[in-house]
Amino acid sequence: YKRQGGLKPNPELPEWSFTPEPAMTAPVEKTVLGQEAEMIYLGWRTGGASSEDADMIQLVSSLLSNGKCGLLDVDIQQQQKMLGVGAEGLQLADYGMMVAIGYPKPGQTLEEARDMLLDEIGKLRAGDFDEELLASTIANYKRGEMQALEENGNRAMAYVDAFINGVDWKRSVEELDRLSKVTKADVVAWANEKLDPEVYAAVYKRQGVDPNIHKIDKPQITPIATNRDKSSEFLAAIQAAEVEAVQPVFVDYASDLSVGKMKQDIEVLYKQNTTNGLFSLYYVYDFGTTTDPAFGIASDYFDLLGTDTQSLQEIQREFYDLACSFGIHAGGERIYVTISGLAENMDKAVKLAEEYMQNVEGDDAVLAQLKANAMKARNDAKLNQNANFRALQQYTSVSYTH
């Protein structure tokens, strides 16, 4: 039986049941109006977290969008055909869903964005993708699981999610083994069964004033008696409990880190990872956007470029096959170049990253589209109230000198 800590289950409690949703036979399209930027959501219903569909949406969402060489990444994001695009799978107890999201670029309609997303779903259904991408997806999923399990919160949530969704724990821990046995034919068959291009739910988020908004009068606030002079037996027991003093452990840079020198007296700090089979390598440069604001957009520009011998898609695919990541982040005072992933592939990833940085080639058309997209993204941000609040907070707390 299921239990949580010292809580005893009620054997008389009836098992939850629900009335299944009727099968969808045609597109269900809804429009939401608001001041925020426009976007489109496409969704397909799948089985719940304990069904076979739960495994497939993990794979399919990564085949569509993984940040490097998914169908949406290569065909849309890296070619800047939309401002932003992505796909994800959501697993719940009764049903799951496969979702594709699109943010239109300047001059693009939501219907055009929708059709682009459906075209990529069509490629998946037709098997128009590299079968070797499946093996790379499994390796990257393995890497993601190792990273997640470094945090105690994620370990705890793995138990919680399995418990809430009614997934047998044995099935939960064997997920990676099952995924590794999935073939391209399995993916194509599943996509044709579940991702019908004629049967989906679409939500169009358009700009405008919603005429159906109902204003509610502000109610009179009722005073609340806080009873701060009283305490429950539970609180009293906690307050009376003996607490062992925490003994802090501080990093000793002299003994906990190995320090070395490279050419030109570049300092190297090293610490072996004894927790799992992952690595992280950082190149740190002591200048940033306060030195030159152009570094900010330069890092975004770099992410869209290839070299004289390799396209961006080929480079991203190599990193994905290695289950490694490479990125450049421009901060105010420093620029960070990060390489991370499976430790067994560290040498190959570092070599690939350094060759990429040394041989990257600019593209005027890519830069022009990046500028246009950046301006739209900034204008979209002005439509978001939270973004405006954050900008005001930053403006009032930071002194600008230029």
Question: How should these model regions be labeled?
Answer:
Residues 1, 402:
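Single conserved hydrophobic/aromatic residue that forms the stacking wall/gate
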Residues 56-64, 159-160, 393:
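Short, Φ-rich (hydrophobic/aromatic) sequence segments
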Residues 2-33, 38-39, 43, 74, ...:
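Proteolytic maturation boundary segments
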